[in-house]
Amino acid sequence: MSKRIALFPALLLALLVIVATALTWMNFSQALPRSQWAQAAWSPDIDVIEQMIFHYSLLPRLAISLLVGAGLGLVGVLFQQVLRNPLAEPTTLGVATGAQLGITVTTLWAIPGAMASQFAAQAGACVVGLIVFGVAWGKRLSPVTLILAGLVVSLYCGAINQLLVIFHHDQLQSMFLWSTGTLTQTDWGGVERLWPQLLGGVMLTLLLLRPLTLMGLDDGVARNLGLALSLARLAALSLAIVISALLVNAVGIIGFIGLFAPLLAKMLGARRLLPRLMLASLIGALILWLSDQIILWLTRVWMEVSTGSVTALIGAPLLLWLLPRLRSISAPDMKVNDRVAAERQHVLAFALAGGVLLLMAVVVALSFGRDAHGWTWASGALLEDLMPWRWPRIMAALFAGVMLAVAGCIIQRLTGNPMASPEVLGISSGAAFGVVLMLFLVPGNAFGWLLPAGSLGAAVTLLIIMIAAGRGGFSPHRMLLAGMALSTAFTMLLMMLQASGDPRMAQVLTWISGSTYNATDAQVWRTGIVMVILLAITPLCRRWLTILPLGGDTARAVGMALTPTRIALLLLAACLTATATMTIGPLSFVGLMAPHIARMMGFRRTMPHIVISALVGGLLLVFADWCGRMVLFPFQIPAGLLSTFIGAPYFIYLLRKQSR
């Protein structure tokens, strides 16, 4: 059986090599007659423009694709090995978003010189790394704390970047293409800088081979074998962060390879660390090589697209196809080294207090605000005039926050993975892509089609996840990997459409950022009715949600039918997410963070966890919507972005408090 499992991806890999080689041959032949290849490679004739392009653009581009792909495969294995999480990749600790934020700032301030942008990218990545290490240091750099801190800091940097894009859309137009990766070269300078740096990274990785191998074991076992765990994690993650920042400097952000290459290496039978490092690097180089040659061909026959988009569009279907053949994979226990507050008693009192606090927040959001004359508390006739404008927005934020928080709670309990959230399942991205696609297909004002288009996108995404994960018995991690594959592909497609410069994308940019701007009374009533129905179903699932975090074997032992249970919970979470996304757009924070905040406050039993998560999610988004309307009055900041600014520091504080 294992030979059959290994044979299939091996044949697939061989097919990809053949296709990449054929495409390279065809692209090179179109650019220059084969009889001139040797001369153009070694000493191009400066009077023949085709030879100059071949020597200074095509060949360096091929070399950089192989180098960057290999580097992404290498750091993907490093992150997955150190964090012991199959979903970890170079963007997990926020390295890519930190580097992107640095580049955005230099672009916005028009700081000249290539070295300035490279330094900014390195500085952004290193600052993010230091923040993440600082938060997790007190817990001996435990994998779960590192993952959560990295995700939150990554979301925070991404929110700042998106905010700058909203207010400086035209100035940062060039950033969209870079954000999805571009391998365009004009000389050999990039290759000459990158290959010695990567070689140094490989040598340091080999020096860390034994500690890295031990880090794949349980923490207690690794310590008993004499490993200084915190120091080893710090060294390995620092190395991975530096290599990732170098790759971002070279070509921008190219996602998915760091996730996909290590998984395919495992499928090919590379169980030991050294073969896995080598094989993942080869697979990464192959995928990026193939993607770039497809781009060169598309540029000639259609239009230029970004490298990261094609990489995701190649990798996502491949991963979905290979998922049923993926052996069982595991994630770190969410409770390892966990020193959360003691389980809270008197849950009803806390829930009532939270409900009162939420009601007060709604009243303040309705009545207190700014106008042309300053701060005012609206009442009487003025409040009646403001109600049609403020009421739908506040209710939309409240309902969406509650639904995303409950969906996040269900998904994290269903999968037992601390990285799980509605956004990771790809349903939000699928809904957003459906809306954007409809915007391009329907002439005139397409916003009337927002709900059906988004619902269809979410439904198709869910269907693909269920088909891909269903053949593997609905393993939680297969669901997450399928969701991540689709989410990455949809996100890259959205960024590619943004980079196209089409004016229609500016219309939907605010909605994508999580704005309540277009909320209407009718939409809020529909959302409220659906929310009440879905929340009424949730308590019926409490036994499942209590038992599933204990593991599949325990669930079977008490007579639970695992596959139908997982399908039902996945459907419930998907409906909650899709409804919230249709109301205010795809958010990137509440569904991930609200369940963790509730758990760290001491609510770990199923129903208290769900109730407090819902209250936290609703409060967070109501407050975020009010701040978004008032902070830069008369300008507005989308609630989805501002919820990150409000929630992330508090979440980091809770993580830090745990580690003391």
UniProtKB/Swiss-Prot annotation:
Q: What is the effect of changing residue 495 to A?
A: No effect on ATPase activity, but 80% decrease in Fe-ferrichrome transport efficiency of the FhuCB complex compared to wild-type
Q: Which InterPro entries match?
A: ABC_BtuC-like, ABC_transptr_permease_BtuC
Impact when changing residue 517 to A: Loss of binding to ferrichrome-FhuD
Q: What induces it?
A: Induced 2.1-fold by hydroxyurea.
What does altering residue 507 to A do? Decreased binding to ferrichrome-FhuD
**Site (Interaction with FhuD): residue numbering on this chain:** 182, 184, 304, 390, 515, 517
Predominant localisation class: membrane
| Name used for this protein in its record | Iron(3+)-hydroxamate import system permease protein FhuB
**Which UniProt keyword terms apply here?**
Cell inner membrane, Cell membrane, Ion transport, Iron, Iron transport, Membrane, Transmembrane, Transmembrane helix, Transport
The UniProt-reported impact of residue 510 to A is: Decreased binding to ferrichrome-FhuD
Q: What is the effect of changing residue 492 to L?
A: No effect on ATPase activity, but 50% decrease in Fe-ferrichrome transport efficiency of the FhuCB complex compared to wild-type
The outcome of changing residue 304 to A is:
Decreased binding to ferrichrome-FhuD
- List the record's Gene Ontology CC terms alphabetically: ATP-binding cassette (ABC) transporter complex; ATP-binding cassette (ABC) transporter complex, substrate-binding subunit-containing; plasma membrane
Phenotype for residue 492 to A: No effect on ATPase activity, but 80% decrease in Fe-ferrichrome transport efficiency of the FhuCB complex compared to wild-type
What is one GO biological process annotated to this record?
iron ion import across plasma membrane
**Family indicated by similarity:** Belongs to the binding-protein-dependent transport system permease family. FecCD subfamily.
Q: SUPFAM superfamilies under this entry?
A: ABC transporter involved in vitamin B12 uptake, BtuC
* Transmembrane feature ranges: 5-25, 62-82, 93-113, 118-138, 147-167, 197-217, 240-260, 277-297, 303-323, 348-368, 391-411, 424-444, 447-467, 479-499, 528-548, 567-587, 607-627, 635-655
